């Protein structure tokens, strides 16, 4: 002998699971939106490091008295909170962290050249330094794309699970509620 369960209780459980999946989708969407803002800012700031390093070379050649204040600005960009946050993210790939550390180390040497107005040495190192910055920007972009792919995949799987669950609830209601009502209606005629 098997125990009969309440149809309404069973349907309520299925609908509760649907609500849980909707909560997951909503939470993930909010996390992705918040993350995108900081990712875009990190890419923007790190991309500006290229232009700032070239501008610093021009400043060294044309107006050496402004070099120190441009070095301070560059250092502020290099140590921006959003870039430091990327370094501390739990899931940030090691490539991003290594690229950022490489830029920090290389910049210490580049800033020394700028401070003592060694234009030739700064110029000689500039192209490879900018390549390191480009590599860092590329790593950030790839990480952002990977996060998007993961988020979209989770959203799609959740939506498919919701669709499957709702389809099952409809089928179950037809079998357990609608069919017996139809049989009762036919029997009463």
Report each predicted region and the residues it spans:
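Cytosolic-side ends of inner-membrane transmembrane helices, especially those
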Residues: 29-36, 162-178
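Extreme N-terminal signal-anchor transmembrane helix of membrane signaling/transducer proteins, especially
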Residues: 5-33
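Juxtamembrane membrane-water interface segments immediately C-terminal to a transmembrane helix
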Residues: 32-57, 68, 72
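Juxtamembrane loop-transmembrane helix junctions in multi-pass integral membrane proteins
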Residues: 3-9, 31, 35-38, 136-139, ...
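Membrane-proximal alpha-helical signal-transduction linkers
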Residues: 176-189
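Extracytoplasmic ligand-binding sensor domains of the Cache superfamily
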Residues: 59-113
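Extracytoplasmic
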Residues: 43, 48, 52-59, 99-150
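N-terminal membrane-entry
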Residues: 13-18, 31, 145-162
């Amino acid at each position: 002998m098997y125990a009969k369960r309440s149809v309404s209780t069973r349907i309520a459980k299925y609908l509760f699971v649907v609500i849980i999946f909707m909560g997951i989708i909503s939470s993930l969407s909010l996390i992705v939106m918040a993350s995108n803002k900081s990712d875009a800012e990190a890419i923007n700031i790190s991309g500006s490091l290229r232009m700032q390093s070239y501008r610093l070379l021009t400043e060294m050649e044309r107006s050496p008295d402004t070099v120190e204040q441009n070095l301070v600005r560059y250092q502020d960009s290099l140590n921006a909170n959003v870039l430091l946050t990327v370094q501390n993210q739990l899931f940030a790939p090691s490539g991003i962290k290594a690229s950022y550390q490489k830029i920090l180390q290389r910049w210490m040497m580049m800033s020394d050249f700028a401070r003592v107005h060694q234009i030739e040495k700064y110029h000689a190192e500039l192209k490879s330094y900018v390549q390191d910055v480009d590599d860092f920007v590329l790593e950030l972009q790839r990480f952002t794309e990977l996060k998007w792919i993961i988020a979209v995949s989770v959203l799609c799987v959740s939506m498919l699970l919701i669709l499957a669950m709702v389809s099952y609830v409809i089928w179950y209601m037809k079998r357990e509620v609608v069919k017996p009502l139809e049989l009762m209606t036919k029997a009463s005629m």
